[in-house]
Design a protein with these regions (language model features):
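Active-site-proximal alpha-helix that buttresses catalytic centers in soluble enzyme cores
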Residues: 2-306
């Protein structure tokens, strides 16, 4: 059978941070994060300890494989004129972004989708840098897909389910969290912050949630980062007399280190010390509404730009 030349060959290249698949991968992973500079023994042991506490690896790699597979099915159902292939590449673990990109020249169109819905030109730049030698007018980039209606719906459903587990008489404060970014002179993160605020406000409005705060987590140890920190917000919530803190990690797309350790271990410990109950809303992980939000970003970019 000859190939139908009227069918466009569309590739969606999904980019994410990546995560070590085992403790043996931690050193190489950490070295790449540090732009080729080897971590000290103390730094390496600290990161290994975190992975050991969450079972030796995060769920990111397994979960994103499922998300990518579901995204391909969703897009193929929507794009009758195309044969859709969705491939995945990582920033700090194999398969690396540049290695995957060099194999995509035979596609009619390549659409690049960052797993972070709240992208800006600045935040996306480090993901796109390895692609520059391969990009041409057949490549399109989804810069931000936080406006996808089902992104808010995905969170609303899981927050609603979580609220049903709270005991009668609980007084919860809701803390939406996202990854902090370093503050640098002349650089604005307003687009990132505003995208997160809109999603937070959408969730709060749909569920009529009072007492909702956006807090920044997982900051580095050097320089100044966005505030308020999740540590400071948790401290204040305790001082205000709330019995429960409900964390909604809207800045993340699946269960990984920043959720399993930075929230489930560190914030849980802090809540217990303050006499509060720790509650976390489940991550998008295997939520089909979240996959539809990813597809929205791809379709909006692909069809809008022709």
């Amino acid at each position: 059978m000859t190939e139908d030349k009227t069918i466009q060959q569309v590739c969606v290249l999904v980019l994410d941070y990546g995560s070590p698949r085992s403790l043996e991968d931690v050193k190489e992973y950490y070295t790449r994060i540090r732009r080729g500079h080897m971590p000290s023994d103390e730094e390496l042991q600290g990161l290994r300890h975190k992975y050991e506490r969450i079972g030796g690896q995060s769920q990111l790699m397994e979960t994103t494989v499922w998300q990518v597979k579901q995204l391909q099915e969703e897009l193929q159902n929507e794009l009758s004129f195309a044969k859709v292939t969705v491939v995945q590449a990582h920033k700090y673990i194999e398969p690396l972004i540049g290695d995957v990109a060099k194999e995509l020249d035979h596609y009619d169109t390549v659409v690049v989708l960052m797993m972070n819905p709240y992208g800006t030109d600045l935040l996306n730049a480090s993901y796109l840098e390895p692609l520059q030698p391969f990009m041409n007018d057949r490549w399109k980039v989804v810069q931000n897909w936080a406006g996808a209606p089902t992104l808010v719906s995905s969170w609303v459903g899981r927050v609603k389910d979580t609220l049903c587990t709270l005991p009668s008489g609980a007084t919860p404060h809701y803390v939406c969290t996202a990854h902090s970014v370093p503050l640098m002179k002349g650089i604005s993160y307003d687009g990132y912050v505003h995208s997160l605020e809109r999603v937070m406000e959408g969730i709060a409005s749909r569920l009529e949630l009072p007492n909702v705060t956006l807090a920044w987590q997982s900051a580095g140890t050097r320089g100044e980062w966005l505030t308020p920190t999740v540590e400071a917000v948790t401290e204040q919530v305790g001082a205000d007399g709330y019995t429960h803190v409900v964390y909604i990690p809207i800045g993340f797309t699946c269960t990984h280190m920043e959720v399993s350790y930075d929230l489930d271990i560190e914030r849980r410990d802090q809540c217990e010390q303050l006499g509060m109950n720790y509650v976390r809303v489940p991550m998008p992980d295997y939520d089909t509404l979240f996959v539809k939000a990813m597809a929205y970003g791809v379709l909006d970019t692909l069809l809008k730009e022709g």
